[in-house]
Amino acid sequence: MPTKYEAGTFDVIVIGAGHAGSEAAHAAAKMGAKTLMLTINLDMIAFMPCNPSIGGPAKGIVVREIDALGGVMGKVIDKTHIQMRMLNTGKGPAVRALRAQADKVLYQQEMKRILEETENLTIHQGMVEELIIEDGEVTGVITQIGAIYRAKTVVVTTGTFLRGEIIIGDIKYSSGPNNQQPSIRLADNLKELGFDLVRFKTGTPPRVNNRTIDYDKTEIQPGDEVPRAFSFETTEFIMDQLPCWLTYTSPETHEIIEANLHLSPMYSGMIKGTGPRYCPSIEDKVVRFNDKPRHQIFLEPEGRNTREVYVQGLSTSLPEHVQTRLLKSIPGLENAEMMRAGYAIEYDSIVPTQLWPTLETKRIKGLYTAGQINGTSGYEEAAAQGLMAGMNAAANVLGKEELILSRSDAYIGVLIDDLVTKGTNEPYRLLTSRAEYRLLLRHDNADLRLLELAYKIGMVPQERYDKFNAKKALIENEIARLREIIIKPNEATQAVIRSAGGSELKDGIRGADLLKRPEMHYEMISSLIPADIEFTEEVKEQIEIQLKYEGYIEKALLQVEKLHKMENKKIPENIDYDAISGLATEARQKLKQVTPLSIAQASRISGVNPADISILLVYIEQGKIAKISG
């Protein structure tokens, strides 16, 4: 046993420096809390062990929300990407999302630079092995070498390191991602403290040398020529982009997999953990979708200064010699040189229904968890949780109100509510279909939804807030102008409408109503009734979306109003569910397990049906717990 010694006192300690840990540490320090971030390896801050990309459906909107709340992921990827594309441009604004290919090394370097320059933040290399708990509250941590750090709150963001094991073929060994040191003692400590842990699994594909790829047999996938950014504050854009490339598996690929399934740890029984449904291994895809003649494979550069190419779509834990054969069966990769083999990794995570919506654990006060330890997959989901946990840990210490985002506020609210209310039996991935109010939770309006909240809690400086208010005023004033001004059916007007393929006007029409026609766009309207100033593309887009989808948005807002009424019906913290007669046994068990804060949250628990909610409402409203709530 190492000699223990007092190493320092902080307000907030963050364990881990991945995507969750980086955001948590930055947020806590930014809010004014004296913060310490401890990581096993300082060279691996914000490392991307799997895909070299940020964003995508739902996830890209989360990155925008992180930026609106004062987080850093969006700013970092804007400075370090090699390609950026807006997805779903042919669909409505609710599902549009930005996706960027990252330069993995530059991304790490930029995040490390930002964190090192953040006031109130100390960064130290060290492995935490034990949490110090006194009277049900966390008071510090102990590292592998015996250093004792005291703190009022602790945020655990251990990713896939908790009792991590890498599996390739019939080989299994203790390891974190990319052959880093795993965290075993801390996993044991969490179990000793009474937390329910589950075993999950994720995987990664092989990487190949780009000099050995025959790109003539693949399809080029360029980035957008239009400047794009995740951060609302980005003003300089990277236009020198690198393409990705598309190819497909072949019948031979599928034959190799089927002939070697007995060597796959997934099918041999070696892997016990549950894998991510929406990111299956190539073995799983071939078995589950055996009617498909081929599967997409994207070749994604890992950076500007490396030969490594990520083979997206070929996640596997088959033996290395089988992986080599798989690669050579894919058009364009016949002579590909594998630089790193794909692998699966199993790890411990906690059952997330053990958390409050603030991400504080119910079992231990002052202890928060964020990222893959909570059962999620993905850098963006991790960063979002880290941001919220870091802000709330700091708020806890500083005597401020903690922030809980509702399902109608943000995708981040959907993510956290799903985790703490429903739990998850597989690595959770955020999807647009999970959000009931997705028309309100768009890529374009993340700042309009969240920046005011961020300013109030100290995550956004005055200068940014003033710029935001100026932008908001421009949008509101122009919408008001378009509602008032009449466009007459003169020749200029009819020519613009005809050019868009629309029906000519018979009478005058308000600018806002003309813009609501599906074929019309703001630029066309403003050419007929110019504004006094030239708006940015961002402002123009907002004006158009708010007016074009006004009817749908109003319907969604009415639904939100109903939700808020249910959210405002609070459930007393110490309610005795056993005392409520008429509740179904399953509902009683689930309510006791999740301990929902409101009727709305209770209604979303799996196994709690409308009849149970009615009984619960009557019980509360009849004043049977007046002495408790009073």
Curated annotation (Swiss-Prot):
Q: What is its main location?
A: cytoplasm
**Binding annotation for NAD(+):** 275-289
From what superkingdom does this record's organism come? Bacteria
| Cofactor(s) listed | FAD
Its subcellular locations are: Cytoplasm
The gene designation is mnmG
| Name under which the protein is recorded | tRNA uridine 5-carboxymethylaminomethyl modification enzyme MnmG
Q: Name one Pfam family in it.
A: SAM_GIDA_C
**Membrane spanning residue stretches:** none
Any one Gene Ontology BP term: tRNA methylation
Q: Which UniProt keywords apply?
A: Cytoplasm, FAD, Flavoprotein, NAD, tRNA processing
- PROSITE patterns, from UniProt? GIDA_1, GIDA_2
Residues bound to FAD: G16, A17, G18, H19, A20, G21, V128, S183, Q372
* Molecular function as annotated in GO: flavin adenine dinucleotide binding
Question: Per its database record, what is this protein's job?
Answer: NAD-binding protein involved in the addition of a carboxymethylaminomethyl (cmnm) group at the wobble position (U34) of certain tRNAs, forming tRNA-cmnm(5)s(2)U34.
Q: Which InterPro entries match?
A: FAD/NAD-bd_sf, GIDA_C_N, MnmG, MnmG-rel, MnmG-rel_CS, MnmG_C, MnmG_C_subdom, MnmG_C_subdom_sf
Q: How does it assemble?
A: Homodimer. Heterotetramer of two MnmE and two MnmG subunits.
Q: Which family would the database say this protein is a member of?
A: Belongs to the MnmG family.
The cellular component terms of Gene Ontology attached to this UniProt record, alphabetical and capped at eight, are: cytosol
Q: Sorted alphabetically, which SMART domains does this protein's record hold?
A: GIDA_assoc_3 (SM01228)
